[in-house]
Amino acid sequence: LTGVRPVKYIRSIYETRDNAEEYLRNSLLVSDKKIRLANDVIRIQKPVLDSLDLRKISLYISIPFCPSRCSYCSFISASGEGALKLIDDYFGLLLKELDIYADIVKRFSLKVDTVYIGGGTPTTLSASQLDRLIDKLGEFDIANIREFTAEAGRPDTITEDKLRTLKNGGVRRISINPQSMNDSVLEAVGRRHTVKDVCEALEIARKVGVD
């Protein structure tokens, strides 16, 4: 019994077999302790899963660019001046792709429940690009979504104009990621900002009034 979500498989066994625990114990060799643990997880998950509306979807928008690449990073992203030259072309294609998905959402009567703008570093985009992106998201009817979050992970990409653009567009939460509050560590891992930059970015966020 392996995988990142083994309980999902166990739940399917309970739904299709009368002798589920016997099958888990004798055929899959799951210990009694793990069966009890799985049962506890299933019991806790059930009210949440039962409440899910399959017509509600989450929209993830990837901005796979960073001003520089951190030495520990395992995410797919592009950095450096050569890569940053691709932003305009990527952004234009992203808007076209959002048009396609907006049409799919309408055609199948889906409802966007949450929006997450991630990366990379979305605040690598200019304030005007962020404004165009949020304007495009208006085609999805996001007025009453449950969550609208944008990563602002690199303090050296944060400006007041960008955060005001995000807030005015409906973004309720941002993430500012110091990674370390030690300048020597930041330099060692390739972050192009200082602890002072982090503090200034947090002050800008407070001033703008975004969480």
Roles of regions detected by a PLM:
Residues 2, 15-59, 108-109:
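N-terminal [4Fe-4S]-dependent radical SAM core
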Residues 13-23, 137-144:
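Generic structural signal for short, solvent-exposed loop/turn connectors between secondary structure elements
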Residues 60-62, 118-119:
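Residues at the beta-strand->loop junction immediately N-terminal to the Walker
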Residues 62-77:
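Local cysteine-cluster metal-coordination motifs and their immediate loop/turn environment
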Residues 77-211:
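Conserved non-cysteine loop/helix-boundary elements of the Radical SAM core domain that shape
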